[in-house]
């Protein structure tokens, strides 16, 4: 049961890392768009999702969202075996993406305006400017805070136990209920969390060294 919990935790972490980076990138670009409507939508997204606890969104997508759909669809979702995992991924994604967008937006604003002018002078379109010039620099400049954010996102996977997602914390609670050996189960789960977070931080630091980025900000990631 504990190993299964670790596997589900890793699935949640990997899925939400990818989806929140993608969604956060889109929101960040919207917030710095020259189109006012896009800026307003991006800003509203961040203000709404950043100021409401992540646990709320996990509960919302598990309990409320199926009720908002046509009855047949809602019924299928409620009886879908893996919906607790799916709802957890969606809830964590929309929450984490609001923070990721803020980080990436700061990275975009830190890029000298001449970089974009140079891209325009070479004939690159707006999409190509982002793909080939701006996005690589945005991610490189913001890797330390992004890494820290992803470690926090990993720890937030434990919130999914509230909707019976069989991740590590939920598995620990079940073991305690079945065996009454809560101390041992909790200690083992703690070691798993420390080990997994340590692997994440080490991988990020190695990537930063490869890219020659100052990684001092990651020293607080486990706090």
Where are the model-predicted features located?
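Transmembrane alpha-helices and adjacent helix-loop boundaries
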Residues: 1-223
């Amino acid at each position: 049961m504990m190993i299964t919990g670790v596997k589900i935790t890793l699935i949640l972490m990997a899925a939400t890392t990818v989806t929140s980076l993608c969604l956060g990138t889109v929101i960040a670009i919207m917030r710095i768009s020259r189109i006012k409507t896009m800026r307003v939508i991006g800003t509203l997204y961040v203000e709404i999702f950043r100021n409401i606890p992540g646990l709320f969104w996990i509960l919302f997508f598990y309990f409320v969202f199926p009720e908002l759909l046509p009855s047949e669809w809602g019924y299928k979702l409620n009886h879908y075996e893996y919906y607790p995992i799916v709802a957890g991924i969606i809830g964590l994604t929309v929450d984490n993406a609001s923070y990721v967008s803020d980080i990436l937006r700061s990275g975009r604003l830190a890029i000298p305006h001449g970089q974009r002018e140079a891209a325009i002078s070479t004939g690159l379109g707006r999409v190509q400017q982002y793909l080939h010039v701006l996005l690589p620099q945005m991610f490189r400049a913001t890797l330390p805070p992004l890494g820290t954010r992803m470690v926090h996102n990993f720890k937030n996977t434990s919130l999914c136990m509230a909707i019976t997602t069989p991740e590590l914390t939920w598995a620990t609670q079940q073991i305690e209920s079945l065996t009454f050996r809560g101390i041992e189960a909790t200690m083992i789960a703690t070691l798993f969390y420390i080990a997994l977070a340590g692997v994440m931080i080490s991988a990020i630091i190695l990537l930063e060294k490869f890219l020659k980025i100052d990684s001092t900000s990651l020293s607080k990631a486990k706090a």
